[in-house]
UniProtKB/Swiss-Prot annotation:
One GO MF term: heme binding
Cofactor section: heme
Protein name per Swiss-Prot or TrEMBL: Sterol 14-alpha demethylase cyp51A
Transmembrane segments: 7-29
A single Gene Ontology CC term: endoplasmic reticulum membrane
Deletion consequences: Leads to the accumulation of eburicol. Leads to decreased susceptibility to azoles, especially fluconazole and ketoconazole, as well as to itraconazole in an itraconazole-resistant strain.
Enzyme class, spelled out: oxidoreductase
Additional detail: Mutations of Gly-54 or Met-220 lead to the resistance to azoles, clinical drugs used to inhibit the activity and kill Aspergillus fumigatus cells during infections. Duplication in tandem of a 34 bp sequence in the cyp51A promoter located at positions -288 and -322 from the start codon also leads to azole resistance, when associated with a mutation of Leu-98. In Aspergillus, the biosynthesis pathway of the sterol precursors leading to the prevalent sterol ergosterol differs from yeast. The ring system of lanosterol in S.cerevisiae is firstly demethylised in three enzymatic steps leading to the intermediate zymosterol and secondly a methyl group is added to zymosterol by the sterol 24-C-methyltransferase to form fecosterol. In Aspergillus, lanosterol is firstly transmethylated by the sterol 24-C-methyltransferase leading to the intermediate eburicol and secondly demethylated in three steps to form fecosterol.
Gene: cyp51A
Annotated InterPro entries: CYP450_sterol_14alpha_dmase (IPR050529), Cyt_P450 (IPR001128), Cyt_P450_CS (IPR017972), Cyt_P450_E_grp-IV (IPR002403), Cyt_P450_sf (IPR036396)
Topological relation to the membrane, as annotated: Single-pass membrane protein
Length: 515
């Protein structure tokens, strides 16, 4: 008993000593070190500000910004992480040179077990740029035009067949429903009918298990034998085998005319600059990446859109009236005609709703890079040392009143007078997968910027636009049980989204579109 008491006492003294030394170090660090950004004060070494950051990143960022300014450093699970907020911070980090900053070292431990080896962050950046160029095949203008009827059909089939929407009215967990809809639309549009037909209950379970690999703990312990990691690895192996089987069978049979326009066929015929044909394993891994990338942000944002419309039914009716006015009735029953790509340009308020939701509810709150060489911060005395992690948060500028008055208010009408395009004088650069705008001069960067800017931005707008327009013309949405507003944000995953379950009410419209 006595030894145990002594051990407890020693441990308590050790902890208190560590805390005291940590506080003393921070005080002297501020006095002596003028070449590094200020350190966010914290009591517990190693843990640092991890908890407050993890609970609500934006609340943490804004509180630190008020106290320390746009540039500060905090401890994230023992790692010194320097945050640089604002438009200049976005430019500094997201457009950093390859020799200075590196994304692969930050994200590879998390993404490689999910996406697979030799793709995305598990390969040299030059190879990733080639892979992005291959993938852009499915994101051309003609491809996007062909996606519209496919996406619309998937949404209509879901509204007709899903148990969530049987009868004339009911309730639905809209986060779960939009996750299902967006995996169907992403698979059908980006991957083809052959892959879409394999989205059975088994495939959905595999996707779910694979998605669990993006839990924050996997930044630190990606290969730990935890239950969710075992399921992740099994799901990846099974999903890869599904794609490899498709590829193998196609090589035996030869491509059919109906397949010659899909992504798998495209990748099967791609060759790297060094003359190597893309291996089947890498094709499978790129297809897994494409499916998850095409679904993740669309799932979260589409759920937020529906939740916002349910909380403000008047906005939903504005959208409906826009379709009636600009697309016009067609058949004898007054039903609206099937959507076409050109129709999306006739629905500006639909685009405003999407943009405003992306502004407030971006699914990625932090973008990180690893510093590779001493990095001076222009206009400051600061020098960021190698090994430090840099963190940009474009969502902070999007939520700042200086750029968007009353920024915390969801108001799609603000975009009627708000410039939506990047500044005309913004530089255009080719990182190896086609010319893109650097983009960082804008306070609105829902798809990132620089060499790692999302290449699926146009597809995302098309996908979200068609999903939104289709649901608006078929359903009314509303909050239930007297609830006001929308749910809180769940930051427990790498991709934030609404707290689950997110229950709203729905009611089917009359076949006559005037009712």
């Amino acid at each position: 008993m006595v030894p145990m008491l002594w051990l407890t006492a020693y441990m308590a003294v050790a902890v208190l000593t560590a805390i005291l030394l940590n506080v003393v170090y921070q005080l002297f660090f501020r006095l002596w070190n003028r070449t590094e950004p200020p350190m966010v004060f914290h009591w517990v070494p190693y843990l640092g500000s991890t908890i407050s950051y993890g609970i609500d990143p934006y609340k943490f960022f804004f509180a630190c910004r008020e106290k320390y300014g746009d540039i500060f450093t905090f401890i994230l699970l023992g790692q010194k992480t320097t945050v640089y907020l604002g438009v200049q911070g976005n430019e500094f980090i997201l457009n950093g040179k390859l020799k200075d900053v590196n994304a692969e070292e930050v994200y590879s431990p998390l993404t490689t077990p999910v996406f697979g080896s030799d793709v995305v962050y598990d390969c040299p950046n030059s190879k990733l740029m080639e892979q992005k160029k291959f993938i852009k095949y499915g994101l051309t203008q003609s491809a996007l035009e062909s996606h519209v009827p496919l996406i619309e059909k998937e949404v209509l089939d879901y509204l007709r067949d899903s148990p969530n929407f049987q009868g004339s009215s009911g309730r639905v967990d809209i986060s779960a429903a939009m996750a299902e809809i967006t995996i169907f639309t992403a698979a059908r549009a980006l991957q083809g009918q052959e892959v879409r037909s394999k989205l059975t209950a088994e495939f959905a379970d595999l996707y779910h298990d694979l998605d669990k690999g993006f839990t924050p703990i996997n930044f630190m312990l990606p290969w730990a034998p935890l239950p969710h990691n075992k399921k992740r690895d099994a799901a990846h192996a099974r999903m890869r085998s599904i794609y490899v089987d498709i590829i193998t069978q196609r090589r035996l049979d030869g491509e059919k005319d109906s397949q010659k326009s899909d992504m798998i066929w495209n990748l099967m015929n791609c060759t790297y600059k060094n003359g190597q044909q893309v291996p089947d394993k890498e094709i499978a891994h790129m297809m897994i990446t494409l499916l998850m990338a095409g679904q993740h942000s669309s799932s979260s944002i589409s759920a937020w859109i529906m939740l916002r419309l349910a909380s403000q039914p008047k906005v939903l009716e504005e959208l409906y009236q826009e379709q009636l006015a600009n697309l016009g009735p067609a058949g004898p029953d007054g039903s609206l005609p099937p959507l076409q790509y050109k129709d999306l340009d006739k629905l500006p308020f639909h685009q405003h709703v999407i943009r405003e939701t992306l502004r407030i509810h971006s699914s990625i709150h932090s973008i990180m890079r690893k510093v590779k060489s001493p990095l001076p911060v222009p206009g400051t005395p600061y020098m960021i040392p190698p090994g430090r992690v840099l963190l940009a948060s474009p969502g902070v500028t999007a939520l700042s009143d200086e750029h968007f008055p009353n920024a915390g208010c969801w108001d799609p009408h603000r975009w009627e007078n708000q410039a939506t395009k990047e500044q005309e004088n913004d530089k255009v650069v080719d990182y190896g997968y086609g010319a893109v705008s650097k983009g960082t001069s804008s306070p609105y960067l829902p798809f990132g910027a620089g060499r790692h800017r999302c290449i699926g931005e146009k597809f995302a707008y098309v996908n979200l636009g068609v999903i939104l327009a289709t649901i608006v013309r078929h359903l009314r949405l509303f909050n239930v049980d007297g609830k006001k507003g929308v749910p809180e944000t769940d930051y427990s995953s790498l991709f934030s989204g609404p707290m689950k379950p997110s229950i709203i009410g729905w009611e089917k419209r009359s076949k006559n579109t005037s009712k």
